[in-house]
Each structure stands twice: as C-alpha cells, then as structure tokens.
C-alpha cells in the first residue's frame, strides 16, 4: 500500500514536471517571437530543443527539477536584475535609438535631394543664360562666313591684278637685265681702249730700251704719239658707259614709282575682321551631390559597423539571460549542499523548534536575538530586510533610477526628433515655383547684320524671363519615421518588470532556500544546527566582551572629556555646548545612548552607590547581574584585586552587592579585600556609598 502511494506520487510529480517544462518552453518561444521579433523558424528550433530538455529533465530528473525551480526565484537576484536592465536597454537601442538614426538618415536624404535639385536648376539657368550669347555668336559666324566669301572674291581680283603686274614686271626685268649686262659684254668684247692703247706704248718703250740700251733716251720719243693715239681711243670707251647711265635712269624713274604704286594698291584691299567670344563656365564634378551624400553615409556606416553589430547582439539577450540564470541556479544548489555559511541567515521553523527543545531541556538558548544579531539574521517570512539586503536594495533602486532617466531621455529624443521633422514636413508640403514678376520686352527695328544680332539677343532674353525655378518640389518631401507605440509598451513593461524585481527581489530570493530545504531536508537540518551552534558560541564570546567593556567604561566614568572641561572653565560657553549632551547617560556594555532607546528601556543597578546602567540586551547577556558591583561574585570572570589604598568606593560597592545578593559571602569577600588592601574595612564607611547611591537613584529618576 505504501509502495503504491509512493509510486503514484512519483508519477504525479513526473507528470507535473513534464507539463511545467512544456509550459516554460512555450512561454519562452512566444516571448522570443512576439517580444524580440526573431524569425519563426529560429524560434521553433529553439523552443523544440528547450522543450525537450525541460520536459524530460523535470519529468525524470530530480536535479534538473530543483535547478529549474531555483531558476524562477533566481530571476529576482542581483545578476538577473542587471541582465534585465541590459535587455531593456537593448530594446531601447533597437527601438527609439534606431528610429532616431532612421529619421536623421531620411532628413539627410531629403537635404541631399534638395541640393541636387537646386544644382540641376542652376545648370538649367546657366544654359538659358548662354542662349543670348550663343545666338549672337551664330550671327557673328554668319557675318564672318559672308565676309569670307567677299574676301575670297577680292583676293581673286587682286591676284589677277598681281599676275598682270608681275608679267609686266618680268618684261621690264628682262629689259633691265639686258641693259645691266650690255656694258659688261661691251667691255669684255672691246675691252678698255685707253688702257689697251697705253699698254701697247708701254710695252714698246720697254722693248726699245732693251734694244738700244746705250741710248735709252731715244725711246722717250714715243710719248707724244701715245698721248695722241690713246686720246682718240678713249672716245670709243663712251659707248660702253651708256648702259650704266640708262640703268640708273630706269631704276630711279620707272622701277621705284611702279613698286610704290603696287604697294598702295595692295593696301587698299587689305582689312582685318576679328570676332572674340569669351564664355567660360567651370562645373567640373565627377559625381553628383546625391552620390557624394551616399558615399558619406556609407563611410559613416563603416565607422559604425562595430556598434551596429554590438546592437544586433542585443536581440539575443533573452537566451543569454536564461542561460546565465540557469548557471546561477546550479551554483546556488552547489554552494547550498557544500557550504554551511552560504545564505544561512534565516530563523526558520526548525530553528525555533530546536530553540524550544533546548529551552525545555534547560540548555543555553540564543533567543531573543540582540539588536546587532537582528540586523543580520531574520525570519524568511519577515517584512523587514537584513542590513545586507537593505544596502543592496538601496543600490539597486539608485541604479534603476539612473537607467530610467537614460531611457526617458532617449525616448523623448526619439519623439522630439520625429515631432520636429513632422512639423517641417507639414509646413513644407506642396510645391513652390518662383516666377518672374515683370516681363520686359525689347523690340529692335532696322535691317542689316547688326540689327539681326540685336534682335536675336532680345528674343533670347525673353526666353530667360519665361523660365521658372522650383524652390520646393514634392520629389524631395521629407517622410519621418513614426515612433513605435508597441515598442514603447514593451519597453515600459520591461522596465516595470525591472522595478518589480528590484522592489520584491529580496523577498522572492528567500524562496531559493525553501526550495532546497524541501528537496534536501537532511542538509537543511545540518545548516540549522551549524547556525545555532555559531550563534551560541558567538553569544558566549559576546558575554565576555560585554563584561570587559563594562569594566573599562566603569574605570573611565570618573574622567571628563574636553567639552566638559571647557564648560567648567568657561561658563559663557555652556549655552553653546548644551546641545551636545554633556551629561548624557549611556549603556556601560554597548555604549548605546539613553536618548536612542529611551530611559524607560534602560536598567540601572539596584546596589546603592553603583553607577551601572545597561540596555536590556546587555543586561540579559550579563545574566541580569551588574558587572560593576557584582564582578567578584560572578562565575564568568575573576577580577584582579589590584586596588589602590585610596580607592574606597569599589570595595564598598562590592561588599554592598554581596550583602544584598549573598550575605554568607560578605565575610569571605571582606577578608579578600582586607588582604589585598592591607587595611580594615569597617561598616561605617557604608553610609557614604548608600547616600551616594540614593543621590544617584534620585538623579536617574
């Protein structure tokens, strides 16, 4: 019967685990598909793989079941909160930030389109501005062509005249050459008659002198004949000189005037016609303005490639989060099973049962906890947080607030950019065309080449005035990208989940211990025993520490601090030093001031003349015994009775406490004190401590 019930429980447990595993895998797949926006095929593969692991693991493996159950409260841990914030910020980067970048991209494209449109219209205006000059240039070219035809005809006519003149010149040149060479031919044929004649007589004279060398004077008789005969021969020489005189006459009278006349005739037909046209427009550009803008966008995209890849990884934060949380759950299970100190700060029901058993058996107990212990050890169902949890709670709230401010700033930036661009789109929609307000017409009258040129120029300027310039065109209309309202809802949900995890994470994280305790009860009992023994040993050490603190403060109580000395020495400073509570009382064990706990919560020693004042916790740790006056009677410590002979107050307090607590020990204590001090202690001196004690009681009341 018992075996059948255990088998039924195992079957139910496996069935529930299998169902829970399938449900968790299905929820994860829907979150990936609808929340993260992944591809359906990838979500299907991931969901099927995760469902196989979770369903089979939770159905048939105790370890997997514990790890998955630990995964749920582990989602409220510090690391999971951090990953949730990272995932939420990833949604912000993929939503508002990406939309802001998209709006800036569309704005830059619209600006580039407008700039290219303006450039094209500028080129069109330049073409229109060139039309008058081109028309004038065509007329000038036509005039030049006609002038060239006339010039060709004049050139032919002039060439005919030049040919005729050249023919006449060649005839005259032949005559000229004949006259020029006729003298040379005459001289070459006839020679120089006078020279030849004188040469003959000179040769005869020389020959005569050779023949009649004895009578050379006879040879001089030929001289008169020489002069006569050679003078007649010089008349023949005049005939050869006539051509040279005729050549000079022809050069000066005929050749020079004829050449001047021909040059003057040529200059009459010479003319220059120059047409100069200067029109230079430099618009050298290898790429259009839109191509330049696209190149700039491509360069910026290359620079931001690493950042875009990092942003793309934000879409896989959910699988990374689940994997990290599962590893954290495995680590928690491992440390729970192997470390007694790990997360062992809870006063559970089993701890209280152990406390009750020890109390009934008369053994030392640890409850109630001290104020210091209560800050570190709490009950699992308590609404109060431990000191460590409070510190982490404050830090997480501050961190979440910082992330919320950054998220709101990015969301407002996205909406602000869209609002500005949409406002610009609303006011710049339509088409604006700039037209000439006044059309001026110019009429040119007259005929001829100049009139035609001026008339063409005027008509070209009429064409320019009729042109229109598009200032705003629908082709460059700005279309900003609207913010995704659904994305805002998802982001708000994620940050709301982060806030919920931060607010209740410390409470939900306590369920991890409960889950492990339900699956490992023997291990939980070991941890509770360790915690109880640690508190008990710590409590014993605390008692000795409190006793030493009481003795130290009792010895220092008669001394005054610097503020008290100043108040006594300088009375006018007392109003200023009054707020510092110069006469403030405090617990002699832990030093807690009376204004924190209230004087009604403090316990004063009932021994007359004793200044002992304790908080309830310290008084309970001292077993409701004053360590100032009852120290020699305590079983927990032994005082060193090394007293000065002038110290009479402490022995009297000890004797009074012994008389009140154990009268039979008074005589024994008196003997020990007399041996230590070397003097006799009489009962007369007790009146002074009693009066001092009464005054002390009156002051405390």
From Swiss-Prot:
It is a multi-pass membrane protein. Pfam families: DC_STAMP. The chain crosses the membrane at residues 15-35, 40-60, 82-102, 215-235, 310-330, 404-424, 488-508. Coiled coil: none annotated. Residues 673-701 are annotated as: Disordered. Expressed in testis. GO terms for biological process: fusion of sperm to egg plasma membrane involved in single fertilization; sperm-egg recognition. It comes from the Eukaryota. GO terms for cellular component: acrosomal membrane. Essential sperm cell-surface protein required for sperm-egg fusion and fertilization. PANTHER family: DC-STAMP DOMAIN-CONTAINING PROTEIN 2, DENDRITIC CELL-SPECIFIC TRANSMEMBRANE PROTEIN. This is DC-STAMP domain-containing protein 2. It comes from Mus musculus (Mouse). The gene is Dcst2.
